[in-house]
Design a protein with these regions (language model features):
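Residue-level detector of family-conserved "landmark" positions at structurally sensitive sites
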Residues: 18-21, 44, 77, 215-216
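Iron-sulfur (Fe-S) cluster-binding segments and ferredoxin-like electron-carrier domains
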Residues: 11-23
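Conserved AdoMet/S-adenosylmethionine-binding subsite of the radical SAM
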Residues: 26-190
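Short gly/ser-rich anion-binding loops that grip negatively charged ligand groups
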Residues: 1, 18-21, 49
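A C-terminal junction/extension of Radical SAM enzymes
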Residues: 193-225
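N-terminal pre-triad scaffold of radical SAM enzymes
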Residues: 1-10, 40
Length: 225
């Protein structure tokens, strides 16, 4: 999906915004019709799927009905800032289909989050906490996953430690991915995440109590700072 409720300075899909007001449309029925017998997962991302969440919900319901009992997992990658009724709809679809919801927890400090994303992280934190309560309904495969982009100079060990401590207080088994940063959009003058930065953040997350921490985008890690 093209739109997003955030305006991140490092957005890797910033060019998607140009298509938000495109005259080219696709109905939920037609989008669901793209699912074939080889498809076992629909993952919505963007941008962010939540500005068009009703379209995504309708598409998912049609696709699941057409699958007629065949495995079709519904997954989401989101900033987590949706209203709670929509979160419930998303979670219900993922729970029943065997899918997951990945929250991008961009920063813990409100000032850093606002500087990087242009908005508060209050709703994201509230929704993550709410969804963590669903995890006991289906421990495996995990319903809730978290990730954080390691932006040099902004998102470092103290930030990761706070985020990880929050996640751990809800459930220490929630998977957490630390993603290497690549310069994009307005932050194209920053370096890629260094290997030492990523390793220090992984240690901080594990010390905060998380048991399932992963470093992603390893190929981007540099040997700098």
């Amino acid at each position: 999906y093209h739109a997003c409720a955030f305006n991140c300075l490092y957005c890797q899909n910033y060019h998607f915004k140009k298509h938000t007001f495109s005259t080219k449309k696709i109905t939920a029925k037609n989008l669901a019709g793209a699912v074939d017998k080889k498809t076992n997962c629909i993952c919505y991302f963007g941008g962010d799927p939540t500005p068009q969440i009703l379209h995504a919900i309708k598409t998912s319901k049609i696709a699941i009905k057409d699958a007629d009992g065949r495995i079709l997992r519904i997954c989401w990658e989101t900033n987590g800032a949706m209203q709670e009724p929509f979160l419930t709809m998303m979670a219900d679809l993922s729970l029943k289909s065997g899918g997951c919801i990945k929250f991008d927890l961009k920063a813990w400090d409100p000032g850093i989050h606002h500087a990087l994303c242009g908005v508060t992280n209050t709703k994201t934190i509230e929704n993550f906490q709410t969804l963590a309560g669903w995890t006991k309904k289906r421990p495996q495969p995990p319903l809730l996953i978290a990730s954080t982009l390691l932006v040099p100079g902004y998102v470092d060990e103290p930030e990761v430690s706070e985020i990880a401590g929050f996640i751990s207080s809800l459930h220490p088994e929630i998977p957490y991915s630390l993603l290497a940063f690549y310069p994009q959009f307005y932050l194209n003058d920053l370096p890629t995440t260094s290997r030492s930065h990523a390793l220090r953040c992984r240690d901080a997350a594990e010390k905060a109590g998380l048991r399932n921490v992963h470093i992603g985008n390893v190929h981007l890690l540099a040997e700098g700072y």
